[in-house]
Amino acid sequence: MYSVKEAFYTLQGEGVQAGRASVFCRFAGCNLWSGREQDRASAQCRFCDTDFVGTDGQNGGRFATAGALAEHITRLWPHPHEGVTPYVVFTGGEPLLQLDAALIEAVHAAGFEIGVETNGTLAAPDGIDWLCVSPKGNAPLVQTRGDELKLVHPQTDAPPERFEGLDFDHFLLQPMDTSGLMASDARKEPLSATVAHCMAHPRWRLSLQTHKIAGID
């Protein structure tokens, strides 16, 4: 059984794949925060800006088999005859709590490339085409290799230099979205700090949440 909070067609907004047409499949549940505001202060990830609780989002639901979820994802891709390889991003919450070999096989059989955005606390299964790891605080990092490491910045417990020796092709810093957590004047500080770090340490590239700028999901 796969529990999906929401699934929708959009443009990838973050990281190296920003701007790419994608079906987003957001799994319900996370291992670093319950998703309830009353638990945020004690969570390992306290800055999450995503609703991943339940299955009541757009095109959300429970799917009994990998094939059923793959069919659901396929129906959300609106351009089957354009000669472009369709792309699905599994995210959460924490997608590796649910993503398994059966679903990877079913989605590949439907013709999709598979991207995953994970907090890295669980080992990724084989068969993922693009793996983005986004470490959170002092949570133990198990997945130490992939295509991109995207670090929300600044995090007191997760300084960028801690990750520079890991086996990733791309290292990105993304300013923490504090719109719901800080007064307006303080919201500019994460962006300024991130820009300054990228300029001082060219290994790191700036990643912005372009979907929020564009006003899309």
Locate predicted features.
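Conserved Radical SAM active-site core
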Residues: 2, 6-9, 21, 32-128
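A structure-centric signal for secondary-structure junctions around beta-strands
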Residues: 19-21, 42, 146, 168
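Short, solvent-exposed loop/turn segments at secondary-structure boundaries
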Residues: 17, 59-60, 183-186
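Short, Lys/Arg-rich amphipathic segments at extreme N-termini
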Residues: 1-24, 194-196, 202
